[in-house]
Amino acid sequence: SLSDKDKADVKIAWAKISPRADEIGAEALGRMLTVYPQTKTYFAHWADLSPGSGPVKHGKKVIMGAIGDAVTKFDDLLGGLASLSELHASKLRVDPSNFKILANCITVVIMFYLPGDFPPEVHASVDKFFQNLALALGQKYR
């Protein structure tokens, strides 16, 4: 679980990430699709998987919006993300291990875009948050 310090670190980090969420999200999604090509299977319905394509641009908005929403639900991620977990488990049928892959790609991109605002202790807090987020999104798979 997240400590009060972790929550504070994530809120501060998100305040800096949020204005650049579109850029960070697009880069992270494009990076995931390139570095982990097996993830493309979940986006086969998209005509173009290149980083600047319309579907990728839309996807990054959805993903980064969901992360921003989760930042407001620290104390009840399971309840707050239940419907999103259900969607990914039942309809989209995304392998839950991919949540961790995407979180890793987002973390890498954050470090590139905001190096001075992402020291190791903040990185650790954001990583814990993403781990909790992945667990919450994977809850309906059980």
Curated annotation (Swiss-Prot):
User: Record's Gene3D superfamilies?
Assistant: Globins
| Role summary | Involved in oxygen transport from gills to the various peripheral tissues.
The record describes its quaternary structure and partners as: Heterotetramer of two alpha chains and two beta chains.
List other remarks.
This fish has ten hemoglobins, 8 of which are anodal and 2 cathodal. The cathodal tetramers do not exhibit the Bohr effect, due to lack of the C-terminal His in the beta chains and to blocking of the alpha-amino group on the N-terminal residue of the alpha chains. The possession of both anodal and cathodal hemoglobins may be a physiological advantage for fish living in fast-moving water habitats.
Q: Name one GO biological process term.
A: hydrogen peroxide catabolic process
Per UniProt, residues of the Globin domain are 1-142
Describe the family membership recorded for this protein in Swiss-Prot or TrEMBL.
Belongs to the globin family.
Tissue-specific expression: Red blood cells.
What keywords appear on the UniProt entry? Acetylation, Heme, Iron, Metal-binding, Oxygen transport, Transport
Q: Please tell me the species this chain comes from.
A: Catostomus clarkii (Desert sucker)
Q: Which residues cross the membrane?
A: none
Which lineage do the record's taxonomy fields give for this organism?
Answer: Eukaryota, Metazoa, Chordata, Craniata, Vertebrata
Record-listed O2 binding positions: 58
**Tagged with keyword Metal-binding:** yes
Instruction: Identify one Pfam family in the record.
Output: Globin
**Protein name (Swiss-Prot/TrEMBL):** Hemoglobin subunit alpha
Gene Ontology cellular-component terms for this entry are: blood microparticle; haptoglobin-hemoglobin complex; hemoglobin complex
Q: Which residues carry this modification: N-acetylserine?
A: 1
Q: Does the keyword Acetylation apply?
A: yes
State the superkingdom. Eukaryota
The gene that this protein is the product of is hba
Q: Which cysteines are joined by disulfide bonds?
A: none
Molecular function terms, GO-annotated = haptoglobin binding; heme binding; metal ion binding; organic acid binding; oxygen binding; oxygen carrier activity; peroxidase activity
Q: What CDD domains does its record include?
A: Hb-alpha-like (cd08927)
Q: Where does heme b bind?
A: 88
